[in-house]
UniProtKB/Swiss-Prot annotation:
Superkingdom, taxonomy of origin: Eukaryota
Gene: LEAP2
Protein name per UniProt: Liver-expressed antimicrobial peptide 2
Localization, UniProt: Secreted
Record keywords, A-Z: Antibiotic, Antimicrobial, Cleavage on pair of basic residues, Disulfide bond, Secreted, Signal
Secretion signal span: 1-22
Primary localization class, coarse: secreted
Propeptide span(s): 23-37
Amino acid sequence: MWHLKLFAVLMICLLLLAQVDGSPIPQQSSAKRRPRRMTPFWRAVSLRPIGASCRDDSECITRLCRKRRCSLSVAQE
């Protein structure tokens, strides 16, 4: 008879352990998190080639963004 009681207690413990293990992770604060900044290594690796679209000089491998394109020369027509 004590085998059944021990088995029942073990099953209840396993059930409770599974409930705790499967519980949802609490939500973190709803404040917007600031995205990580790129390190200098990744900034250099991710530079765009000549002719690629760009927003500013820092995105181009030549450091010249003209008319939203990476350029080779300053005065390109």
